[in-house]
Amino acid sequence: MTTRAPLISQVPVDGAALRTLAARAPEDFPVFCDSAAQGPLARFSLLAAAPVASITRDRHGGLEAQNVELVPGGFLDNLDAWARPTRPAGNNAQSLPFIGGWFVYLGYELAAEIEPRLKLPPADAPWSAFALRVTSLAVHDLASDRVLAVTEDGDPHAHETLVARLVDAGRDTPPDPSPLRLARLDEDPPQRFLEQVRAAKEHIAAGDIYQANLSRSWRLKLADDADACRVYDALRAANPAPFAARVTWRGYSLLSSSPERLLRISGRDISTRPIAGTRARQVTKEGGSAQQDRADTAELVQHPKERAEHIMLIDLERNDLGRVCEAGSVKVDEYMVTESYAHVHHIVSNVRGRLRADASAVDALRALFPGGTITGCPKVRCMEIIAELEGAGRGAYTGSLGWLGSDGDADFNILIRTLTQRGPEIELRAGAGIVADSIPERELEETRAKARGMLRAFVAA
């Protein structure tokens, strides 16, 4: 057990200091989990200082560790061994969600470690998963508008250094979030996606699956020299979201404006918040009426196809949670509500349960990952069909990013509305849920509506 009390200090700066500090030294602050949208889901932003230990899984499944000793097994076995709670739950006077632990990235292809029968094509990325042990971080509490420096192990020198860097960053003007110029923008051929939708519908008609989420790619090249922090700031301004993030690790970056939560663990309470059902939003900064918003959301929640897809996926999430929860504890406590973001409306539900005493946070990840809303039902067969139809690795897209606290709590998003960047090259994916009565052209337009929010971060050169 860790016995030295954490150090937590309020710093006289505003929340923009976290983004300024991240932009100044992305290698020193590799992970920024950012509540970039207003609302009840957006309470805390976390900026992680350089890790004291790490576990990395490469694109072929090989493991590398720094300052920890690998145990037999795969990435999740090692994460489970090293991320076990070392502090009692709720053991901080400020009631912060996270005061130290592991920041974790899971690429979509990690699913093959959970379900060995899956043969997924590797993604074009240097790593497929990593976990970073962090003992120092900055926290922005949006409810009170306080910025806090946190040093879990109570190291006074590390704490004073973090406070000084935040104060210095607070003197600077926040980074420029203006759109970035593009030299090139390529979109996957629309006809190919239409054919994939028809093929998925054939699988549904044959009884292989009930629903599948198919995605397509956009590839961009920047005209100017813009690092990941600048790209993230432009994305954040164009498409704010409650589970946004910027990660830079070993020369590769992922930049997310995700609206979706995979799981939240607080004590023994666990929840997942599936999104299924989307409409392009006609009310934007450029114009539109609130009356149009109301009409669009009403049509969305009443549409038979959207309702059927959503109900099917609620059942999938209930079953997944039931694998790690106490019998009879899994409930749907929010049912088919609408959430509106800058460019789309979504149907959202919340499913919660009571985590069994013998189940860890990593056990919960094994049960839920990847999220059913971005695979389909039944999950494993859908993933086999997705791999066959898409023909390429997804990487960060529909993976997950979040944290495992040293008190056992956890919070993970689903990496939708997410860019990956290596130098000037950027890639993004967007998908749509396919069911028996899907209209291929309408599903194509849904992928474009989802991509549009991200593409607003860029302008033609």
Predicted region positions:
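Extended alpha-helical targeting/anchoring segments
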Residues: 1-461
